[in-house]
A protein has these predicted regions:
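A conserved structural/catalytic subdomain of Rossmann-like adenosyl-cofactor enzymes
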Residues: 1-187
Length: 187
């Protein structure tokens, strides 16, 4: 599990091509100079044999441009196993929510061609300055991850084709609505 710097700037193609072994390390493409999120992710993928889990800014799963093209190539290789949306205000340095992207180079047969999206944005205990994940919150997330199935208002298994139809946007909130339907009283 890694938590690299989010949206780190200054790591576009020109900078990354100066690195040793850049052809193997950045085989899915180069990110923009504005965000090195997918440079960090590709570095980890190039260094791993099986699974990688990355805590990263939510924009990493939804931004367009070069980042979308990198996501597309990684999806076409069927390397993304799960995207878990975490609550906001979990980290000291930002109030923004995060996602955990789980990559698996050796997906079991029952997970091939599929991605599990978990919307855990409401799974927290409120704190004064920060929210926290309780033991129960963590257990619920882990159980959903292990079961790899649809759970109403919490998780959804999508196909790579569905991700393609969503323009490679893997934001769990796009596929798993947690908003309660409002009930109106007649006037």
């Amino acid at each position: 599990l890694a938590n690299p710097p989010w949206n780190q700037d200054g790591y576009g193609e020109d900078t990354l091509k100066r690195a040793e072994f850049w052809q193997k390390r950045f085989e899915y493409g180069f990110p923009t100079n504005q965000s090195a999120d997918w440079a960090w992710i590709q570095h980890m993928l190039a260094s791993s044999k099986e699974k990688v889990a990355v805590v990263i800014d939510t924009g990493a799963v939804s931004r367009g441009g070069k980042e979308k093209l990198i996501r597309q190539k990684i999806l076409e290789k069927d390397l993304i196993e799960s995207v878990i949306l975490l609550p906001e205000k979990l980290f000291y340095n930002t109030g923004a929510p995060a996602v955990v992207i789980v990559f698996n180079k050796q997906k079991p047969e029952n997970k091939k061609g599929k991605i599990l999206l978990i919307n855990a944005s409401k799974e927290y205990q409120e704190g004064k300055k920060q929210n926290l994940l309780t033991k129960e919150n963590i257990q619920k997330i882990v159980k959903a991850y292990r079961e790899f199935k649809d759970i109403e208002k919490f998780s959804k298994v999508i196909t790579i084709e569905e991700a393609k139809q969503a323009d490679y946007n893997l934001s769990p909130s796009r596929f798993v609505s947690i908003i309660e339907e409002e009930k109106y009283r007649p006037l």
